[in-house]
Amino acid sequence: MTGRLKLVLASGSPRRLSLLNQAGIDPDALRPADVDETPERGELPRACANRLARAKADATLKAVQLDDDLRGSFILAADTVVAVGRRILPKADLADEASQCLRLLSGRNHRVYTAVCLVTPKGNCRQRLIETRVRFKRLTEEDIRGYVGSGEWRGKAGGYAVQGIAGSFVVKLVGSYTNVVGLPLYESVSLLGGEGFPIRSGWLNAG
């Protein structure tokens, strides 16, 4: 590969893109992977996040290999799983799903896992799994109805977005906040930098 090193984000998530931009990294392309995100029967949360992040990276790699402009790019993929014990909560698409998630999370501890998978221009794969523990306040039915009415939960793991209204539900958070948003920033940037991606090239005049 010659010329400037490029980065493809294997996601269409505005949150993941915004987090990378916050760190001064602007991907050259967004290539969301079309992957079935249904957990396998009996699959544990950690294993599910790791499997899906790798599947997204592999699917995007195949697509990028057909693109002359992007072939040989770094590919960054991630998958976030919210779990209560061993139970994996859905990425809520329906109001009923979101309501069920919120009732389950109400007044309880849960864990958020994000697996990050980086494929280098040489085809090497590096993967990290980050865990954050979160506790919600006890939610009233008014809280739940109001939040579901906001629509903020759509497509979000566990049926909530911590960077929005649901941030006011959090009593305690132990670990990476950006992990709960959808991309553990420290670990993702460390992976990129460790594999030779110029993580500081976008810092000039960033302010």
Curated annotation (Swiss-Prot):
Task: Please give the Gene3D superfamilies that the UniProt record associates with this protein.
Answer: 3.90.950.10
Kindly state one GO CC term assigned in the UniProt record: cytoplasm
E.C. number, please? 3.6.1.9
Cofactor(s) the record lists: a divalent metal cation
Query: Biological process (GO) annotations?
Result: nucleotide metabolic process
- Report the principal subcellular site: cytoplasm
Recorded family membership: Belongs to the Maf family. YhdE subfamily.
Q: What is this protein called?
A: dTTP/UTP pyrophosphatase
